[in-house]
């Protein structure tokens, strides 16, 4: 069976990596769909789809995951219930089940007739992209403990940490 694991991965962190390992223990193949591909350079979505694709691929390679069992692709989407699932169907290879921790994705997929499974949360209080972006914004280096080494290095190489601090400044923040 082939599972679809959609997410924004802003950034891809160790919790996501644990989910990928968990899924590959249960399914023959895994499709990782990088959602909101049209979004970047904002506090909620600081990284481009291409940057996130690199983060995911390098994390899996770093961990020794057989990339022949994984398809990774970004998708631009309109998140209305009916449109989202149709867009996924247009861009994704065939899948048998959708795996998500997002209640809206779970509900939309189920209502569209797909087999769905809730993804387990691995240390969500620590491995949480919102928390990681906040740590980066606050220049707290603990964020690097929450992501694979390749992601930490990639974010620093592209100055993604600086980008997050820049895009979260408001009009009242001093330079």
Curated annotation (Swiss-Prot):
Pathway: Cofactor biosynthesis; NAD(+) biosynthesis; NAD(+) from nicotinamide D-ribonucleotide: step 1/1
Pfam family, one: CTP_transf_like
Keywords associated with the record: ATP-binding, Cytoplasm, NAD, Nucleotide-binding, Nucleotidyltransferase, Pyridine nucleotide biosynthesis, Transferase
Group of enzyme by EC: transferase
Record-level Gene Ontology MF annotations: ATP binding; nicotinamide-nucleotide adenylyltransferase activity
Catalytic activity: beta-nicotinamide D-ribonucleotide + ATP + H(+) = diphosphate + NAD(+)
Domain of life: Archaea
Matching Gene3D superfamilies: HUPs
Compartment(s) of residence: Cytoplasm
Main location: cytoplasm
EC code: 2.7.7.1
GO terms classed as biological process: NAD biosynthetic process
One GO CC term, this protein: cytoplasm
PANTHER family: BIFUNCTIONAL NMN ADENYLYLTRANSFERASE_NUDIX HYDROLASE, PHOSPHOPANTETHEINE ADENYLYLTRANSFERASE
Family listed: Belongs to the archaeal NMN adenylyltransferase family.
Name of the protein in question: Nicotinamide-nucleotide adenylyltransferase 1
Organism: Sulfolobus acidocaldarius (strain ATCC 33909 / DSM 639 / JCM 8929 / NBRC 15157 / NCIMB 11770)
